[in-house]
Structures are given as structure tokens and as C-alpha cells.
């Protein structure tokens, strides 16, 4: 989850795998090397008091974990801020804004995860990753990411943020992602609205990589109609 300073659009680098003209991916989907987490006994009860004390290790005077606290938190748990596991964690905490955790979000989410310390959270990493492999959970995470990354005074995602978040969520699983990224790079679009965002996921799940089953009369957003037209021209040129 990119650390966001003063709620500006995140500076996450776009992730695209070795396609011509694309930037090198700086988004990691793996945790940094770290010492093995201390084994946590299943009988060790969750402590709300301990969880709150853990929160205050990172929170500022406003009782919010902000950019500096988030950076320290990521360092302590051994995860890069841009790692997709941070997005899944934010989803579990129901965090409203990228780069920030409120006390209420922390307590509610960590209680749900039964985590009151670094070691317990590290022991839940496999569970958090598993949410990405569940079709329903991934769809919820994907939809959550739109509002999470969006500037709250805007109804749409700026296109750079959209590209970065799409790279994080679909870059390793959608065969057409790098082509779609190229299309967005040269397109006239400067923002992506919620309907477009939702439909990109549906498109990635249902349309073949060769576009052979794309229904031109379907209820796809114009953005995707234009992408298909652009790609077909490239294929025949």
C-alpha cells in the first residue's frame, strides 16, 4: 500500500513486465526477507489493551497512523508499503484513505484478525494472501481499491493512480494487462470512473486474450470498446 503524504495521489510506480516502451515495475508482490516470526500459541488470547498500545507505537497526536507511522509499521512487519498485502490489510481494516489508519479502523480490523502485535500479524500473512485467490474476496478487494486510492474530493481516479493500482491488482494475472497499460499510456483518458474500473475486472475475467469473444454490442464502457478497436488495428498492421 503506497505511503501517501498529505493525501495526494500515491507515487506508486507502474508495474509492467518487460513490454517494450513500458516502465520497469517497482511494485513488489512479495515481502522483504525477514527473520522467522516468533511462533504464536493458539491459546494466547487477543488483548484489546495490547492492540491499542501497539497502535500508539505508530500513531501521531491526532490518533491516526499517518505516512511516517505507516512507513515504520511496514518496516517492523517486514513488508514494503507498495506490497499488495498492505492493500489486503487495509481492506480488512476497512481503511478509508490510503496511507492512513485511524484508531477505530485499527481496533476493529485487528480485532477481526485477532492480532495485537507484530508477530501475530506476520503469522496471518498467508491468510491475507489467500484472499487474493478467492474469486469473491478478490472482487471485493478490487472494488474497495477504487475508493481507497481515490482523492476524496474527486469522484474518479486520476489515470496514473488507476494504472498503478491496476498493475498491483492485475499485472501478474491478466495476460492483456501490459497491452491495456500501453493503451492507457497513449489514450486521451485522464481519469477512470467507477463504472470503467469495475468493468476492467469483468473484461479481464471474461474476454479472451485474442479478443475473439468480445461482444461489440455488449454493455461495455466506451473506454473498453476503444481499447479493443485499438488492439485489433495493431494486430492487423
From Swiss-Prot:
Entry keyword set: Cytoplasm, Cytoskeleton, Nucleus, Phosphoprotein
Q: What is said about the domains? A: The DCUN1 domain, also known as PONY domain, mediates the interaction with different cullins. The DCUN1 domain mediates the interaction with the N-terminally acetylated NEDD8-conjugating E2s enzyme leading to the NEDD8 transfer from N-terminally acetylated NEDD8-conjugating E2s enzyme to different cullin C-terminal domain-RBX complexes; the neddylation efficiency correlates with the DCUN1D5-cullin and DCUN1D5-E2 interaction affinities.
Task: Name the GO terms of the biological process aspect.
Answer: DNA damage response; positive regulation of protein neddylation; protein neddylation; regulation of cell growth; regulation of protein neddylation
Q: Specify where it is mainly localized.
A: nucleus
What PTM annotation applies here?
A: Phosphorylation at Ser-41 is independent of cullin's interaction. Phosphorylated in response to both TICAM1 and MYD88 dependent Toll-like receptor (TLR) pathway activation. Phosphorylated in response to IL1B stimulation.
Give the function comment from the record.
Contributes to the neddylation of all cullins by transferring NEDD8 from N-terminally acetylated NEDD8-conjugating E2s enzyme to different cullin C-terminal domain-RBX complexes which is necessary for the activation of cullin-RING E3 ubiquitin ligases (CRLs). May play a role in DNA damage response and may participate in cell proliferation and anchorage-independent cell growth.
How is this protein organized at the quaternary level? Part of a complex that contains DCUN1D5, CUL1 and RBX1; this interaction is bridged by CUL1. Interacts (via the DCUN1 domain) with the unneddylated cullins: interacts with CUL1, CUL2, CUL3, CUL4A, CUL4B and CUL5; these interactions promote the cullin neddylation and the identity of the cullin dictates the affinity of the interaction. Interacts (via DCUN1 domain) with UBE2M (N-terminally acetylated form) and probably with UBE2F (N-terminally acetylated form).
Name the gene for this chain: Dcun1d5
Gene3D superfamilies attached here? Answer: Cullin, PONY binding domain, EF-hand
Domain of life assignment: Eukaryota
Question: Which GO MF term does the entry hold, naming one?
Answer: cullin family protein binding
One Pfam match, given by its short name, reads Cullin_binding
**Compartment list:** Nucleus; Cytoplasm, Cytoskeleton, Spindle
Any one cellular component term from GO for this entry?
Answer: cytoplasm
Query: Which residue numbers delimit the DCUN1 domain?
Result: 46-232
Q: What is this protein called?
A: DCN1-like protein 5
Q: Which residues carry this modification: Phosphoserine?
A: 41
Its source organism is: Rattus norvegicus (Rat)
Amino acid at each position: 500500500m503506497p505511503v501517501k503524504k498529505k493525501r495526494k495521489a500515491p507515487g506508486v510506480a507502474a508495474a509492467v513486465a518487460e513490454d517494450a516502451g513500458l516502465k520497469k515495475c517497482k511494485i513488489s508482490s512479495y515481502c522483504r526477507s525477514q527473520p522467522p516470526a516468533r511462533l504464536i500459541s493458539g491459546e494466547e488470547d487477543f488483548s484489546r489493551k495490547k492492540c491499542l498500545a501497539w497502535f500508539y507505537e505508530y500513531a501521531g497526536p491526532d490518533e491516526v497512523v499517518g505516512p511516517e507511522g505507516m512507513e515504520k509499521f511496514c518496516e517492523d512487519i517486514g513488508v514494503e508499503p507498495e506490497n499488495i498485502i498492505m492493500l489486503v490489510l487495509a481492506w480488512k481494516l476497512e481503511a478509508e484513505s490510503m496511507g492512513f489508519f485511524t484508531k477505530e479502523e485499527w481496533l476493529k480490523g485487528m480485532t477481526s484478525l485477532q492480532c495485537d502485535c507484530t508477530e501475530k500479524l506476520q503469522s496471518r500473512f498467508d491468510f491475507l494472501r489467500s484472499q487474493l485467490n478467492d474469486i469473491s474476496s478478490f472482487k471485493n478487494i478490487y472494488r474497495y481499491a477504487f475508493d481507497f486510492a481515490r482523492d476524496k474530493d474527486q469522484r474518479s481516479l486520476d489515470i496514473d493512480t488507476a494504472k498503478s493500482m491496476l498493475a498491483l491488482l492485475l499485472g501478474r494475472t491478466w495476460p492483456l494487462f501490459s497491452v491495456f497499460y500501453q493503451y492507457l499510456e497513449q489514450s486521451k483518458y485522464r481519469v477512470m470512473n467507477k463504472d470503467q474500473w469495475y468493468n476492467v475486472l469483468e473484461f479481464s475475467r471474461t474476454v479472451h486474450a485474442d479478443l475473439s469473444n468480445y461482444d461489440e454490442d455488449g454493455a461495455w464502457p466506451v473506454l473498453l470498446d476503444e481499447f479493443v478497436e485499438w488492439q485489433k488495428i495493431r494486430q492487423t498492421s
